[in-house]
């Protein structure tokens, strides 16, 4: 049991974190697209705001996919590298927000509307997660072998379908069901 815990703790911690974060954002992809527009405005990239909804769905699906791949222990090396790069990117982004002299963004939106963290708390969380991801990356490259099988492909396709279904369902439900209901009544 101890060996199992030593090998699996980082998979579980990072996997649950990515699945929860991605799912909470996927429940309201429109709200996340507004947050992405704030980030684009902060970096003087407002011209890219037309892609904010697509980026929102892609971010939700990517986070849920990576989390499920971690929990299912699929494509371990590729997943470990990708998760570490994601967390490194988020850490750099939160550092830029935390040190922004104008304070344009008050809250990162890491967990959607479920949990609000200050920029300092978000930066500290990302530093801690970067350490965990680095340890996970080191353990995976030390332990994992490149075993290819068709089960991994099937499970990965299933994970991608689930990960893209949730934000797209939320988006289409919001725009078509809610808007048509409001228009007709």
Give names to the regions the model predicted.
Residues 3-25:
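N-terminal signal-anchor transmembrane alpha helix
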Residues 10-11, 17, 31-141:
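Hydrophobic alpha-helical segments
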Residues 19-21, 87-95, 161-169:
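Aromatic-anchored segments of alpha-helical transmembrane domains
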Residues 147-178:
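Internal/C-terminal transmembrane anchor helices
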Residues 182-185:
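Extracytosolic and intramembrane catalytic regions of membrane-associated proteins
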């Amino acid at each position: 049991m101890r060996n199992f815990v030593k090998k699996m703790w980082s998979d579980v911690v990072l996997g649950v974190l990515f699945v929860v974060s991605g799912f909470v954002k996927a429940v309201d992809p429109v709200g996340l697209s507004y947050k992405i527009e704030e980030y684009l405005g902060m970096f003087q990239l407002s011209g890219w705001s037309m892609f904010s909804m697509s980026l929102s769905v892609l971010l939700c699906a990517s986070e849920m996919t990576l989390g499920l791949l971690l929990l299912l222990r699929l494509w371990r090396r590729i997943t470990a590298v990708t998760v570490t790069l994601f967390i490194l990117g988020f850490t750099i982004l939160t550092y830029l927000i935390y040190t922004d002299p104008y304070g344009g963004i008050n809250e990162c939106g890491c967990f959607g509307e479920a949990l609000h963290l200050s920029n300092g708390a978000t930066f500290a969380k990302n530093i801690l997660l970067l350490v965990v991801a680095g340890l996970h990356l080191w353990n995976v490259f030390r332990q994992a072998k490149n075993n290819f099988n068709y089960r991994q492909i099937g499970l990965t396709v299933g994970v991608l379908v689930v990960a893209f279904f949730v934000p797209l369902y939320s988006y289409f439900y919001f725009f078509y069901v809610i808007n048509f209901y409001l228009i007709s009544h």
